[in-house]
Amino acid sequence: MQFKRVKRNIDGVLLLDKPLGISSNQALQMVKRLYQAAKAGHTGSLDPLASGLLPICLGEATKFSHFLLDADKSYRALVTLGSTTTTGDVEGEIMTQAPVTVTQSELEAILQDMVGDILQVPPMYSALKHEGKALYAYAREGVEIPRKPRPVTIHAIALERFDGKQFEMVVSCSKGTYIRTLAEDIGSRLGCGAHLGGLRRLTTAHFNLKNAVTIEQLDQMSQAERDAVLLQVDAAIEDFPIVTLDADSAFYLLQGQEVWKSGLSISGLFRLYSEQGAFLGLGEQTSRGSIAPRRLLRQAGE
């Protein structure tokens, strides 16, 4: 007889250091199994070729995962000059080759030219959908789908190392930026072609790798130790302003009603807490000046 594993209603944010060789969804399922979590979601895909920071939201934290999905991110990228590939990275077949005569000053100038608001054509080897089918599925069939350029922002690029054939750069960018495409565009600007040799995500929003754990480390922990490395649900939105409500206001807000707080003037979303410091959820000030609930925790209202 087979028994179903009991799922846990566990809430929090895990900072995972995803290894090479597995997809973000595979990493998510491993974490979900280790925590026996009833609900989990990641906050922005990393290709199997890429390693690094993958925040995973468990339980009620999934209500706020889209804020991390939309957040700025930074990466360390290894770029190989002198060749292009079918996938834009080291896993593809070489399409073109050219001699590399680039100097470091020329490379640095091109990198700085890429900083700012730019347009990127998404790669065919991506999870973007066309008529319900992922672009990479078309690419594997040899079908090229026209893609419209998308606006992204490159906040900064720092050249870390250059040996004449390869270079490492740290890129800070907006959501939706494809580092593979950035590498290809740099190679095109240099006139020699380029492809991505390796990629590691360093930050997502205000999170970094300092307190991230690996799947192997999680696997060796007891359940209590695993639970202890989880961040609180509100960690995903800690950049939002804080508003504290008295007991009566908190009660009515958790019933879905608008409440009032004198002297409040905040634009946009803010975090709501009880006088005891319990996180209630997100609220927003209406045009009338009242506080309207926007996203509340399940436990807070129970």
UniProtKB/Swiss-Prot annotation:
It catalyses: uridine(55) in tRNA = pseudouridine(55) in tRNA. The keyword ATP-binding does not apply. It is an enzyme of class 5 (isomerase). The active site is at residue 47. GO terms for molecular function: RNA binding; tRNA pseudouridine(55) synthase activity. CDD domains: PseudoU_synth_EcTruB (cd02573), PUA_TruB_bacterial (cd21152). It comes from the Bacteria. One of its GO terms (biological process) is mRNA pseudouridine synthesis. Pfam families: TruB-C_2 (PF09157), TruB_C_2 (PF16198), TruB_N (PF01509). Keywords: Isomerase, tRNA processing. The keyword Cell cycle does not apply. Its EC number is 5.4.99.25. Responsible for synthesis of pseudouridine from uracil-55 in the psi GC loop of transfer RNAs. Belongs to the pseudouridine synthase TruB family. Type 1 subfamily. NCBIfam families: TruB. This is tRNA pseudouridine synthase B. The gene is truB.
